[in-house]
């Protein structure tokens, strides 16, 4: 696997090694021994969301959970935002195309707001977490918060009530 730093402090982009032949493709998404070189976190929960085109989930995060995210099917526009006041990249954001073709993964430390916008008819978004979900411990950054100046490839995404309300950063 290839690992590289991103523009946001502590965020890693990871590309697993792929093996392709006439039968298709094989790749190892996660091996705890290999990931020991990338993070000391132990993942305890896996989650999947399935979304149709232009559904936007996020931006969500908390200050205690490390996440490993990827798209297993389709194409997603992943936008992440640094909401850690102590971080040298606080208030900055970065976007990535995650897809079943590039199989890129993002390792997100606590305090990073995480979102995925479905760009294909259907996406399957997969993420591992090193803590169990805790109701009421998450933050939501509003997708169109003017202080962040996010760029999205669509102007009217499909949002949940939670994401529609969101929260603005002071």
Predicted regions and their residues:
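Non-catalytic, conserved peripheral segments adjacent to functional cores
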Residues: 1-101, 122, 127-170
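Conserved metal-binding segment of the jelly-roll/cupin
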Residues: 98-121
């Amino acid at each position: 696997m290839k690992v590289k730093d991103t523009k946001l402090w502590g965020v890693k982009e990871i590309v697993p090694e792929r093996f392709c032949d006439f039968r298709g493709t094989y790749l190892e998404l996660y091996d705890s021994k290999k990931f020991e070189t990338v993070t000391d976190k132990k993942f305890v929960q896996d989650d999947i969301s399935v979304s149709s085109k232009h559904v936007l989930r996020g931006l969500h995060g908390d200050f205690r959970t490390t996440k490993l995210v990827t798209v297993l099917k389709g194409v997603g526009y992943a936008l992440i935002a640094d909401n850690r006041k102590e971080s040298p990249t606080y208030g900055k954001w970065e976007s990535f195309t995650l897809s079943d073709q590039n199989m890129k993964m993002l390792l997100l430390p606590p305090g990073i707001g995480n979102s995925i916008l479905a760009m294909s008819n259907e996406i399957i978004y997969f993420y591992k977490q090193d803590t169990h979900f805790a109701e009421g411990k998450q933050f939501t950054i509003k997708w169109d918060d003017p202080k962040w100046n996010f760029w999205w490839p669509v102007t009217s995404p499909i949002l949940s009530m939670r994401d529609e309300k969101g929260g603005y950063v002071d």
